[in-house]
Curated annotation (Swiss-Prot):
It comes from Alkaliphilus metalliredigens (strain QYMF). Keywords: ATP synthesis, Cell membrane, CF(1), Hydrogen ion transport, Ion transport, Membrane, Transport. F-type ATPases have 2 components, F(1) - the catalytic core - and F(0) - the membrane proton channel. F(1) has five subunits: alpha(3), beta(3), gamma(1), delta(1), epsilon(1). F(0) has three main subunits: a(1), b(2) and c(10-14). The alpha and beta chains form an alternating ring which encloses part of the gamma chain. F(1) is attached to F(0) by a central stalk formed by the gamma and epsilon chains, while a peripheral stalk is formed by the delta and b chains. One of its GO terms (cellular component) is plasma membrane. This is ATP synthase subunit delta. The keyword Cell inner membrane does not apply. GO terms for molecular function: proton-transporting ATP synthase activity, rotational mechanism. The lineage of its organism: Bacteria, Bacillati, Bacillota, Clostridia, Peptostreptococcales. Belongs to the ATPase delta chain family. F(1)F(0) ATP synthase produces ATP from ADP in the presence of a proton or sodium gradient. F-type ATPases consist of two structural domains, F(1) containing the extramembraneous catalytic core and F(0) containing the membrane proton channel, linked together by a central stalk and a peripheral stalk. During catalysis, ATP synthesis in the catalytic domain of F(1) is coupled via a rotary mechanism of the central stalk subunits to proton translocation. It is a peripheral membrane protein.
Amino acid sequence: MAELVAKRYAKALFQVAFEMNRYEDVTEELAFVAENLKQHSDLNELLKSPVITLGEKKEILSTIFKEQISPEVFNFLRILLDKSRQGDFQEIYEEYKILADAGKNKIEAVAITALPMDNNDLLKLQVNLSMSSGKNVKLKNEIDPTVIGGVLVKMGDKIIDGTVKARLNQMQDQLLQIIV
C-alpha cells in the first residue's frame, strides 16, 4: 500500500516538474531534503510526531527549508504534511528518482553475485545491459552468498537470472519433460 501511495505522489510531483522543465532541479532539492532528514533524525521525528500540531510542523518546515528549496518542492512538502504522508517521504523520493532517471533515459541496475565482481567485468556487464535495453544503465554490485554462481541482474521491473541455480532448474525441467 505504501509503495502505491509513494508512486502516486512521486508521479504527481514529476509531472509538475517535467512540465516546468525542472525535474532535474527538483531531484536535487529532494535529495537535499532527504539528506537533512537523514542527518537530523530529531527533525524527522518532530515532523512525524502526533503531539506537534500541523501548524507547528509547517512552521518548522518553513524555518528550515523555505529559503533552501523551490516553491514547488516546498509546497509539495506542505501537501505531505496536510495529508499526513511525511513518513512516506523517503519512499516518494526513491520513486521520484526512478521517474527522473527514466526521463533522462537512465536506469539503475543491481548485479547480485556470490563474490564481488571486478571492475572490468562490471563494466562489460553494464555496457551489455545498456546496449540491450537502449538506456544508460548505472550498475552496482551486491553480494549474496546464497547465489552459488553466476549473476542475478535486477533492472527496473526486470530480472535476468543467470545464476547456476536457475540453469540447474531449467535443466531439471527439460529432463522431466523428456521423461514424462
